[in-house]
């Protein structure tokens, strides 16, 4: 049986009203809310790694009582469901109160190692923060969130996790592209897991409302529970050090997104974790043909605010909004300027280390920058697959560089032929730089393969899993969970999961373009 220790409820002010009725909630960090039951829950998938972390057995999670709990139809001992209150800047503008509109936390589990895991159901029904929505989630978006949460973890990227995927047996109406064509889709619920789901927006809402008392309580609680290393810091220094840690963690997170070609798609401040975790897997995508301007989110297609190449700048902008909120408690500008400067330094250091590792150099040198910028430009113009390119680059013999090794990363044979001479020139320069670096070739190859994944959750693969799951077949979900456990290994016999995006998927909904509809 799990041990719950629901500190968020116990130590922070709550909403006195207990109904699920839509409302503005003031002076409270959370509202008690019961999940809305579903008709016929069915457990489709679960994460073995999260079961182990929570100290749950497969027998337990498959039991009717646990399936009911994961579907919102019942509670296990110690569970106290609630929805959190927060606001946020969305696409650069303050959006007011947002909150958990369809996510309902069940409580905080503490395992025998003392690790704290908050369990949260996404798609479990209406809360006071649902605005005009129904509080539900569709199978399509739930499969994507379940798969990507665990895929990112195995890539070594800080992330919230996923315990389970449950089909509800109910129909949910969604207009996938907001074009006036709503359709009935199957409902589902993901149980997300994280040490904390606190976001930048949790702090912003109280600052915007000039509720300094609640804001201070939330800051003190967050530091005490989630940043124990700061408990003994002098009070006058604690907030500055805390903000600095958040800035550095965020910088490192974004550099890791960029390393593997992950595009979040909707980096609003309510989707930014205070712990520096990847949170809220909505219209995310993985870069296929390299393009810094690519965004998977149709809502962002015109402005490309959240495109691949802008993610570092957007993260900094979001940190500025957090600084703005904290300034109401401690109006000392230098604290926040120092934190933001640390973000810049941490990102540049981490990104330099990422680039050196991806290209197989022993360390970053500024002299590499023109060489790397040139190939990124070539990859964009020639439509070169990012994941395949870096994996094959590890096979290049610097003493006898063979351009043919890289050809499998090209989507267009015609474009490859056009840019082949320039790639050949670049490869010669790269080989010279590699030889000058003096690294052992075998060591270089192994090091590159540790940071350049063979397998990522390509957009079309996720869509194939969704299409099959819609027919009741979860085999693709299971196959992807299996192969993505070891994304840096070759895994003979599983090469099809590393295949480039096929032509049919280039403009297919769910494969190249997604919306916030979920």
Curated annotation (Swiss-Prot):
Statement: the UniProt record of this protein carries the keyword Nucleotide-binding: yes
HAMAP family with a match to the protein in the record: YdiU_SelO (MF_00692)
NCBIfam families xrefs: PRK00029.1
Functional description taken from the UniProt entry: Nucleotidyltransferase involved in the post-translational modification of proteins. It can catalyze the addition of adenosine monophosphate (AMP) or uridine monophosphate (UMP) to a protein, resulting in modifications known as AMPylation and UMPylation.
Protein's name in the database: Protein nucleotidyltransferase YdiU
Active site, UniProt feature: 270 (proton acceptor)
Enzyme class per UniProt: transferase
Signal peptide: none
EC number: 2.7.7.-, 2.7.7.108
Database matches in Pfam families: SelO
Gene Ontology molecular function, alphabetical: AMPylase activity; ATP binding; magnesium ion binding
Catalytic activity field: L-seryl-[protein] + ATP = 3-O-(5'-adenylyl)-L-seryl-[protein] + diphosphate; L-threonyl-[protein] + ATP = 3-O-(5'-adenylyl)-L-threonyl-[protein] + diphosphate; L-tyrosyl-[protein] + ATP = O-(5'-adenylyl)-L-tyrosyl-[protein] + diphosphate; L-histidyl-[protein] + UTP = N(tele)-(5'-uridylyl)-L-histidyl-[protein] + diphosphate
The organism's place on the tree of life at top rank: Bacteria
Sequence similarity: Belongs to the SELO family.
Taxon lineage: Bacteria, Pseudomonadati, Pseudomonadota, Betaproteobacteria, Nitrosomonadales
Cofactor: Mg(2+); Mn(2+)
Residues at which Mg(2+) binds: 271, 280
Binding annotation for ATP: 99, 101-102, 122, 134-135, 192, 199, 280
Keywords attached to this entry: ATP-binding, Magnesium, Manganese, Metal-binding, Nucleotide-binding, Nucleotidyltransferase, Transferase
